[in-house]
């Protein structure tokens, strides 16, 4: 699961056609925030902007939706298997064979 700056980068690259995204939808927590210390020592965290991709998609509350959804399974984790990596490598192999996006 990813969020914040990783969503901004991934969503931005996906929106301009420079990345294919595999896995699960990200957290949808992509607002840049500031941390202000209050007089009593507490810290107030507040958003000061929004992130919108090149195609106009707002990531906050939505997340980056993968081009290829790969379910996350506990048994794969316990077995040391990474189905997301397998899917990405399979796509790369297909691209190399055909020289076009599968």
Placement of each model-derived feature along the sequence:
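Conserved acidic, small-residue-rich alpha-beta core segments centered on
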Residues: 1-91
């Amino acid at each position: 699961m990813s969020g914040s700056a990783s969503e901004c980068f991934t969503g931005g690259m996906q929106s301009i056609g420079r990345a294919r995204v595999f896995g699960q939808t990200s957290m949808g927590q992509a607002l840049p925030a500031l941390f202000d210390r209050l007089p009593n020592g507490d810290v107030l965290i507040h958003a000061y902007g929004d992130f919108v991709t090149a195609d106009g998609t707002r990531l906050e509350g939505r997340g980056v939706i993968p081009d290829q959804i790969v379910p996350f399974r506990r048994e794969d984790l316990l077995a040391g298997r990474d189905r997301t990596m397998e899917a990405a490598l399979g796509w790369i192999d297909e691209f190399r064979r055909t020289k076009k996006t599968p």
